């Protein structure tokens, strides 16, 4: 698969009122999809791919059979009919965000359900924020294997950080 991806930038209108020119910027990047322990925040499994890969294809790679919880929490990028059917066959309960219907406002019930799901799903975002802010993780490698090694080491360091946090917390009572 091609690791290059395009990032689209919407141009602002020009001063004379004419529309600006939209641009597409090619960029080289990687994605890290993780599953975490909801109780303690440890990273259970990680899959690194190039940035051009669709998120919905990653769900099967990060959902593990050794996880005793039946709920699967994810954002809308992971929702597809194939993933929903797969989760049902795996006896899992989908807690994946719902997308807004095209051309209509999101129903209030769906919006409230997404807000409730976000409270749990935000734990995953803490993993990425911790890696970016505390560890200064920025991938500047060429080759998926090097990027995977760097991200795996960052995940290991994050898990050690979480372990120390829980050990100190338990020691304090």
List PLM regions with ranges.
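Polybasic low-complexity intrinsically disordered regions
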Residues: 1-86
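Short, acidic/turn-prone active-site loops that include or flank metal/cofactor-
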Residues: 48, 98-102
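Short, charged, surface-exposed secondary-structure boundary motifs
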Residues: 57, 82, 103-110
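Short, solvent-exposed amphipathic alpha-helical segments in soluble enzyme
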Residues: 63, 88-90, 173
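Acidic/polar loop patches that form or flank catalytic/metal-binding clefts of enzymes
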Residues: 70-73, 95-96, 165-166
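Short secondary-structure boundary segments
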Residues: 76, 98-99, 126
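Short hydrophobic/aromatic-enriched beta-strand-loop microsegments
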Residues: 90-98
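Basic, amphipathic alpha-helical segments enriched in Lys/Arg and hydrophobic/aromatic residues
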Residues: 112-173
